[in-house]
């Protein structure tokens, strides 16, 4: 048995436990007889934590339009804490996926709403649609609305891949064909002659064929070209919808400077209600997803009040001040498919004030291998802890901070939450992150 820190080893089993429980593990080593933990070199006291950052997916009910999301999130987190036996602490982060925020708001629009807005803003004749991402969920349904709002669509696809890395054709094929993607403009016929049919690695879709057929099915004429210079669209159309996400402002500026008559970005389509629809004043169609065959769920709007309300409810019920954020796509890149997982305009559109800024951290490996390479054991631990306690408020340029990921807190935590919650059937649209702001010195 084990009592008051005494470890007893038997010939065939190792018994480890305390006054309340006993765990027996297989053991085939020698009999060490009686041993006390006090005889062992232990570098951490009994009062210190053994766990740092913890990310938990929180199960919630299915969210419908009109639901009190603030109350549902608060209750779900507190019930999970009670059921699973953990406590809410100051500076915990409660993250809510953008999908359930938009669902609770009822922030939707239809394909016909998109068509009406495109026609009103770009004239309804020939429209150049440039640099869309290759996605059935993200863009195809928007393209249906765009095509219904014009007589002809000239679709200009970037190559060899779209903005977030979905590949139309491999770089090896580009090299073998002697094509310069920075300057060469390819017609559909030339593209097929050089590269044939190329299907997406994961979906099996030939997006060139798919997008062309979709445009024609909506009653518009379709012409497809391939180029990476925005100006390449101007011989074909002077009313342009640029569909890139993170480079949209530069693309629009280049087109207007080059003489385009009218240019809209996706954030300017559905940025106001159409026939009573939802909208997003800041991001328009950016961040939208397919809801049904004819409806689009837009990125959430006006959710600053939501994160503040959840923060207040948790404070009122637990006495703890937590941070709260709404998150969408994480900003990570898939090394297999080479896809940058950020089809939303931002990782987090709304968050509480404690999530502003970037981490200010020292690199433990650097300190251990350089400043304190002559130390070990408790002396090393205390020296590193003292460095952390006395670190400058701004470590930019300090060699001891190199490799510590100087990115926005919301991008880092939002990416962690996106990976935790998943995008399928986990049923955890809320994530609780604990210990993110702790360091090696926190007990």
Predicted segments, located by residue:
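N-terminal amphipathic/hydrophobic targeting modules at extreme N-termini
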Residues: 6, 12-23, 29-35
């Amino acid at each position: 048995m084990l009592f008051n820190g005494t470890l007893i080893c038997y010939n065939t089993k190792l018994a480890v436990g305390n006054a309340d429980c006993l765990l027996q593990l297989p053991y085939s080593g020698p009999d060490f007889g009686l041993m006390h933990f006090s005889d062992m070199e232990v570098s951490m006291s009994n009062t210190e934590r053994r766990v740092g950052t913890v990310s938990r997916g929180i199960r919630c009910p299915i969210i419908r339009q009109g639901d009190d999301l603030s109350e549902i999130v608060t209750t779900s987190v507190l019930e999970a804490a009670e059921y699973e036996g953990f406590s809410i602490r100051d500076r915990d982060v409660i993250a809510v996926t953008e999908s359930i925020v938009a669902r609770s708001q009822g922030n939707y629009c239809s394909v016909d709403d998109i068509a009406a807005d495109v026609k009103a803003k770009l004239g309804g004749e020939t429209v150049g649609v440039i640099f869309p991402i290759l996605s059935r969920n993200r863009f195809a349904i928007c393209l249906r609305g765009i095509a219904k709002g014009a007589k002809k669509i000239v679709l200009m696809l970037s190559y060899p891949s779209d903005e977030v890395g979905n590949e139309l054709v491999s770089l090896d094929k580009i090299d073998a064909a002697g094509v310069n993607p920075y300057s060469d403009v390819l017609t559909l016929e030339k593209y097929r002659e050089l590269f044939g049919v190329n299907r997406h690695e994961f979906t099996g879709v030939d997006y060139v064929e798919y997008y062309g057929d979709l445009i024609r099915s909506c009653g518009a004429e379709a012409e497809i070209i391939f180029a990476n210079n925005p100006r390449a669209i101007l011989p074909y159309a002077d009313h342009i919808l640029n569909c890139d996400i993170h480079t949209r402002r530069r693309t629009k500026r280049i087109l207007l400077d080059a003489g385009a008559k009218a240019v809209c970005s996706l954030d300017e389509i559905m940025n106001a209600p159409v026939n009573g629809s939802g909208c997003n004043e800041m991001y328009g169609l950016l961040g939208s997803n397919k809801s049904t065959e004819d409806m689009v769920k837009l990125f959430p709007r006006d959710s600053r009040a939501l994160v503040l309300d959840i923060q207040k409810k948790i404070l009122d019920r637990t006495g703890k001040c937590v941070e709260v954020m709404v998150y969408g796509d994480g900003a990570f890149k898939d090394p297999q498919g080479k896809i940058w997982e950020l089809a939303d305009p931002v990782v987090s559109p709304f968050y509480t004030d404690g999530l502003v800024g970037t981490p200010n951290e020292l690199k433990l490996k650097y300190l251990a291998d350089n400043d304190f390479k002559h130390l070990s054991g408790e002396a090393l631990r205390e020296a590193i802890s003292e460095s952390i306690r006395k670190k400058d408020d701004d470590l930019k340029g300090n060699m001891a901070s190199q490799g510590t990921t100087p990115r926005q807190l919301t991008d880092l935590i939002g990416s962690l939450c996106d990976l935790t919650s998943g995008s399928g059937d986990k049923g955890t649209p809320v994530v609780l992150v604990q210990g993110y702001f702790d360091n090696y010195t926190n007990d």
